[in-house]
Amino acid sequence: MQKTSMLTKEQANKRRQWYIVDAAGLVLGKLAVKAADLIRGKNKVDFTPNQDCGDYLIIINSDQVVLTGNKKENEFWYHHSQYIGGIKKVSGRDMLKKQSDKLVYNAVKGMLPDNRLSRRWITKVHVFKGDKHNMEAQKPTTLNWS
């Protein structure tokens, strides 16, 4: 009888790597799906759904990501200031100009399942507007998702 081996937390921590992706010209949804799979560890042979076995990801040039269709005009993001009448509405065009890092971060977060483990996974994503970042010490490997 064949025994199934499960990945332990210590083994997963030893195998973590840092990756960097240039988001310039990439479609937002496709970028978010690939990023979510990478930080979950679904690209690994020893993927275990109940363990945090994913890698770290740095996304640069988030201000050059592409929104397809009419999402720039017809899609809105809402937040509330907790005061009466304090609902704020931001269009895709404004979100891409002012808070593109938050736009990409929320897209990746939306591709993850809603559980306790996803709160640990989302901490592995680091999004930057330009091509400069402060993660050089980790020596990230470049991924080409174009």
UniProtKB/Swiss-Prot annotation:
Keywords: Ribonucleoprotein, Ribosomal protein
GO molecular function: mRNA binding; structural constituent of ribosome
GO biological process, one term: translation
Protein's UniProt keywords contain ATP-binding: no
GO cellular component labels: cytosolic large ribosomal subunit
Known partners and oligomeric status: Part of the 50S ribosomal subunit.
NCBIfam families: rplM_bact (TIGR01066)
Known role: This protein is one of the early assembly proteins of the 50S ribosomal subunit, although it is not seen to bind rRNA by itself. It is important during the early stages of 50S assembly.
UniProt name for this protein: Large ribosomal subunit protein uL13
Highest classification ranks of the organism: Bacteria, Bacillati, Mycoplasmatota, Mycoplasmoidales, Mycoplasmoidaceae
Protein's gene: rplM
